[in-house]
């Protein structure tokens, strides 16, 4: 499998389906991930090939090329839109119907610029949770395009402009694509994730990050553990689209408590390379997270030993200790 060097992410262990072509930037720049027809073309060369670490990878995301990623049969396109300092919004475009949605628009202008560039309207706004850095663009986008806001029924009073309130196990349709609603509390009480089984993609907001999980602002370790366990039960080739570009700092923490994990070592080096090139590390894959994310591996003896977690501690207790260690970690 050929490695991708110019345009990549943590999911770029999947072969690009066509040659990369330079494109003009959208403010601040946009990467378009086309989830087109085809089967998974390969899984993580990273597992067998060491990659060199590059320095100074914490700069803002700037993406000037587009890359098509073969996944499963689907007409859904997913476009990554950097917002604020380290947030990602995601534009969803169904090729068959032209329907467009956006997940977690923290601000309106970058989303409007991306839509205008492709002469597209906006039909839906999907929010994973109520925090302003995920809903800040709701009202302006709704006012301009007449888009309907989709969110958690538990956060009905906290999501600006909400029109459709969904609860756990609901199935909502986006232009013929079935969307499974998963309640994933922990970061907030009303957090939900949007799972598109036909595209093997999940939007996890601030519940699951690459190599980490969200801070426990409103929930408990028990809630976060249950949420993460639900998410990792999805197929290994599921692409994970989270709310922030935190992977570089997360990798440093993960290595500090599990320095002998060779898969993590290679992935951390690859992440550093991407950030040095000002490229996103998102999407990641479920398989990679299961192998490297300490919050998904709370029973691991090396992690427990590094943090002094008692053998008698259950997984929720261990997750709470790991979360507190991450909160206090200085790279």
UniProtKB/Swiss-Prot annotation:
<dbReference type="GO" id="GO:0009507">
    <property type="term" value="C:chloroplast"/>
</dbReference>
<feature type="binding site">
    <location>
        <position position="187"/>
    </location>
    <ligand>
        <name>Zn(2+)</name>
    </ligand>
</feature>
<feature type="binding site">
    <location>
        <position position="131"/>
    </location>
    <ligand>
        <name>Zn(2+)</name>
    </ligand>
</feature>
<feature type="transit peptide" description="Chloroplast">
    <location>
        <begin position="1"/>
        <end position="68"/>
    </location>
</feature>
<keyword id="KW-0408">Iron</keyword>
<feature type="binding site">
    <location>
        <begin position="244"/>
        <end position="246"/>
    </location>
    <ligand>
        <name>substrate</name>
    </ligand>
</feature>
<keyword id="KW-0809">Transit peptide</keyword>
<dbReference type="GO" id="GO:0046872">
    <property type="term" value="F:metal ion binding"/>
</dbReference>
<keyword id="KW-0934">Plastid</keyword>
<keyword id="KW-0479">Metal-binding</keyword>
<dbReference type="GO" id="GO:0004416">
    <property type="term" value="F:hydroxyacylglutathione hydrolase activity"/>
</dbReference>
<comment type="similarity">
    <text>Belongs to the metallo-beta-lactamase superfamily. Glyoxalase II family.</text>
</comment>
<dbReference type="Pfam" id="PF16123">
    <property type="entry name" value="HAGH_C"/>
</dbReference>
<keyword id="KW-0378">Hydrolase</keyword>
<dbReference type="Pfam" id="PF00753">
    <property type="entry name" value="Lactamase_B"/>
</dbReference>
<keyword id="KW-0150">Chloroplast</keyword>
<comment type="pathway">
    <text>Secondary metabolite metabolism; methylglyoxal degradation; (R)-lactate from methylglyoxal: step 2/2.</text>
</comment>
<feature type="binding site">
    <location>
        <position position="206"/>
    </location>
    <ligand>
        <name>Fe cation</name>
    </ligand>
</feature>
<comment type="function">
    <text>Thiolesterase that catalyzes the hydrolysis of S-D-lactoyl-glutathione to form glutathione and D-lactic acid.</text>
</comment>
<dbReference type="InterPro" id="IPR001279">
    <property type="entry name" value="Metallo-B-lactamas"/>
</dbReference>
<comment type="subunit">
    <text>Homodimer.</text>
</comment>
<dbReference type="InterPro" id="IPR032282">
    <property type="entry name" value="HAGH_C"/>
</dbReference>
<dbReference type="InterPro" id="IPR050110">
    <property type="entry name" value="Glyoxalase_II_hydrolase"/>
</dbReference>
<protein>
    <recommendedName>
        <fullName>Probable hydroxyacylglutathione hydrolase 2, chloroplastic</fullName>
        <ecNumber>3.1.2.6</ecNumber>
    </recommendedName>
</protein>
<feature type="binding site">
    <location>
        <position position="134"/>
    </location>
    <ligand>
        <name>Fe cation</name>
    </ligand>
</feature>
<feature type="binding site">
    <location>
        <position position="206"/>
    </location>
    <ligand>
        <name>Zn(2+)</name>
    </ligand>
</feature>
<feature type="binding site">
    <location>
        <position position="133"/>
    </location>
    <ligand>
        <name>Fe cation</name>
    </ligand>
</feature>
<feature type="binding site">
    <location>
        <position position="129"/>
    </location>
    <ligand>
        <name>Zn(2+)</name>
    </ligand>
</feature>
<keyword id="KW-0862">Zinc</keyword>
<feature type="binding site">
    <location>
        <position position="244"/>
    </location>
    <ligand>
        <name>Fe cation</name>
    </ligand>
</feature>
<dbReference type="InterPro" id="IPR035680">
    <property type="entry name" value="Clx_II_MBL"/>
</dbReference>
<dbReference type="GO" id="GO:0019243">
    <property type="term" value="P:methylglyoxal catabolic process to D-lactate via S-lactoyl-glutathione"/>
</dbReference>
<dbReference type="InterPro" id="IPR017782">
    <property type="entry name" value="Hydroxyacylglutathione_Hdrlase"/>
</dbReference>
<dbReference type="InterPro" id="IPR036866">
    <property type="entry name" value="RibonucZ/Hydroxyglut_hydro"/>
</dbReference>
């Amino acid at each position: 499998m050929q490695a991708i060097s110019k345009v990549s992410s943590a999911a770029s262990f999947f072969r690009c389906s066509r040659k990369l072509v330079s494109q003009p930037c959208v403010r601040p720049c946009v990467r378009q991930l086309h989830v087109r027809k085809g089967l998974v073309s390969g899984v993580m060369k990273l597992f067998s090939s060491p990659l060199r670490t590059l320095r100074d990878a914490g700069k803002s995301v700037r993406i000037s090329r587009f890359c098509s990623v073969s996944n499963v049969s689907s007409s859904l396109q997913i476009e990554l839109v950097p917002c604020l300092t380290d947030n990602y919004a995601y534009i969803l475009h169904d090729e068959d119907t032209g329907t467009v949605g956006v997940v977690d628009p923290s601000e309106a202008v970058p989303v409007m610029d991306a839509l205008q560039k492709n002469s597209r309207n906006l039909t839906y706004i999907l929010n994973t949770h109520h925090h302003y850095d995920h809903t800040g663009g709701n009202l302006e986008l709704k006012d301009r395009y007449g888009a309907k806001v989709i969110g958690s029924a538990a956060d009905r009073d906290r999501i600006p402009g909400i029109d459709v309130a969904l609860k756990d196990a609901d199935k909502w349709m986006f232009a013929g694509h079935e969307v499974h609603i998963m309640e994933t509390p922990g970061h907030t009480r009303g957090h939900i994730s949007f799972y598109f089984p036909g595209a093997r993609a999940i939007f996890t907001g601030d519940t699951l990050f690459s190599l980490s999980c969200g801070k426990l602002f409103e929930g408990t370790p028990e809630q976060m553990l249950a949420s993460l366990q639900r998410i990792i039960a999805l197929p290994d080739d599921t692409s994970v689209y989270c709310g922030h570009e935190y992977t570089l700092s997360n990798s440093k923490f993960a290595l500090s408590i599990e320095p002998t994990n060779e898969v993590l070592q290679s992935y951390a080096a690859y992440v550093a390379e991407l950030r040095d090139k000002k490229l996103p590390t998102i999407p990641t894959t479920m398989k990679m997270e299961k192998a490297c994310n300490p919050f998904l591996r709370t029973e691991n003896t090396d992690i427990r030993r590094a943090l002094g977690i008692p053998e008698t501690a259950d997984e929720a207790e261990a997750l709470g200790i790991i979360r507190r260690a991450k909160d206090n970690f200085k790279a």
